[in-house]
């Protein structure tokens, strides 16, 4: 039987950077009992994004954060848009260079992720507001 469901996660990161949300998504997906289908994850913000990234080695996430510090530095003289502080425009740049939506296949009731892959909220602001992450899955139910 075809089933389609959605929900919204509220996520508040403790700091700027990558914060794994795989388990929260997995718990919700398990509760919906979808055997095979497609999961869509959407971050409804312009200063945070979603990435699939290495989930075992913290150093990989730290290196990624350092790279983004170089690509989009907090330097007010570089930007005209700074309405919410020196991290405002760099946060928008970081978001533009990543993604706000992910599509992940579901097979045998599980997300199809590689061994070392995790789903992360990539928070680009220091103020770390609560983020809304929309989840939607469509597929064959158990």
Q: Residue locations for each model-derived region?
A:
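Active-site histidine-anchored catalytic micro-motif
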Residues: 1-142
